[in-house]
């Protein structure tokens, strides 16, 4: 029995990591599809430099609601993301950084390495224990949308 407990703990940890990764990937797919659709409809405000401005309150609510519905995640899950600057490497409206927390664990996706690159590689980060999202860093660019933009108790036309 003493040999079995450590191996079961490792198995459980791997299962938890896979569950968080599946939730985060579901969120990423839903968020990217929602942003692509909004961009195609001309609903995303673009500034004079060709970058995206944060959406107004009503648009942010609508986008966040659609992402929550498409991802089928619990509304208690927290997420936030930024969009990449459009250039030859990335098409317009590509998610650059996505942070996700399900209330117990946290994971980050980066389209390119962050700073320092060794601690913030491109792709999915390791799953970490956390009860909430960290404060958005200005080094990660302009925060475009977050789960708290969805406010079901507030009227949105």
Predicted region positions:
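Long, low-complexity intrinsically disordered regulatory regions
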Residues: 77-79, 83-84
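Short, flexible N-terminal segments of the mature chain
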Residues: 43, 53-64, 115-118, 126
């Amino acid at each position: 029995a003493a040999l079995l407990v450590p191996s079961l703990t490792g198995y459980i940890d791997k299962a938890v990591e896979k569950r968080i990764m599946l939730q985060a990937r579901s969120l990423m797919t839903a968020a990217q599809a929602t942003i692509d659709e909004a961009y195609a409809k001309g609903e995303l405000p673009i500034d004079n430099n060709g970058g995206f401005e944060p959406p107004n309150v009503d648009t942010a609510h609508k986008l966040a609601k659609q992402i929550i519905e498409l991802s089928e995640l619990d509304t208690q899950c927290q997420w936030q993301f930024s969009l990449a600057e459009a250039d030859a490497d990335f098409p317009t409206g590509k998610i650059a950084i996505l942070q996700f927390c399900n209330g117990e664990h946290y994971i980050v996706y980066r389209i390119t390495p962050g700073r320092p690159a060794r601690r913030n590689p491109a792709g999915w980060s390791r799953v970490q224990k956390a009860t909430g999202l960290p404060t958005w860093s200005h080094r990660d660019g302009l925060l475009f949308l977050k789960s708290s933009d969805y406010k079901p108790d507030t009227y949105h036309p």
